[in-house]
Amino acid sequence: MGSDSEILNRELSKLSDEDLLACTKEELVNRLRKEESDKMSALIQRGRLIKEVNKQLQGHLLEIRELKVINQRLQEENQELRDLCCFLDDDRLKVKKLAREWQLFGHHAAKVMREDLGGYLKKLADLERMQDGLVKENLDLKELCLVLEEECVSRSDSSPGGSTDLNIPCMVARDVGDGSSSTGSVGSPDQLHLVCSPDD
């Protein structure tokens, strides 16, 4: 029995002719059906495995297609970013150049303004000195007019022809300004000569 069960557990293809002849028809039929059933189960299992592998392959192919689409989109975005970077870099260089030009212009303008301001300050100082000189000159002329007026009045009072007519022109010659206006020139020697000229 031990040898018979061992023979049954072995595949038919691995049995020798003597072992096959030793088996009965029922044993051979059962053995054959068992092997066919095992082979069918193996084929079914293999088919399932193939379907599973195909399904996984389809999933991988779909994932690869999606990755290709994503890669293409990323390449396009990368190219757009490159173009944008080039544009921004050109714009940056233009702005940098413009800023440098404005800086040079600012330095030049500041230099010119300093020079002009220095000239204006010098002219202002000269004008102030001239104004001070004119004020002093007007004060001197005013004092001179007062002296000449007093002299004219005294000469008019001492003349025998009457002093009323001569006193009025002498009073007109007085400068009532503050010494800084142009009317202070009324007391110039030429005009005083005309005013007080009856005795000349």
Swiss-Prot record:
Subcellular location: Nucleus; Cytoplasm, Cytoskeleton, Microtubule organizing center, Centrosome; Cell junction, Adherens junction
Gene Ontology BP annotations: negative regulation of DNA-templated transcription; neural tube closure
Record keywords, A-Z: Cell junction, Coiled coil, Cytoplasm, Cytoskeleton, Nucleus
Annotated segments matching region Disordered: 178-200
Comp. bias regions, Low complexity: 178-188
Coiled-coil spans in chain: 57-84
GO CC aspect terms: adherens junction; centrosome; cytoplasm; nucleus
Effect of disrupting the coding gene: Morpholino knockdown of the protein results in neural tube closure defects and a disorganization of the neuroepithelium. This developmental phenotype is associated with an alteration of cell-cell junctions.
InterPro entries in the cross-refs: CCDC85
Domain of life: Eukaryota
Similarity comment: family membership: Belongs to the CCDC85 family.
Role of this protein: Functions as a transcriptional repressor. May inhibit the activity of CTNNB1 in a TP53-dependent manner and thus regulate cell growth. May function in adipocyte differentiation, negatively regulating mitotic clonal expansion. Plays a role in cell-cell adhesion and epithelium development through its interaction with proteins of the beta-catenin family.
Name of this chain's protein: Coiled-coil domain-containing protein 85B
Organism for this UniProt entry: Danio rerio (Zebrafish)
Protein encoded by which gene: ccdc85b
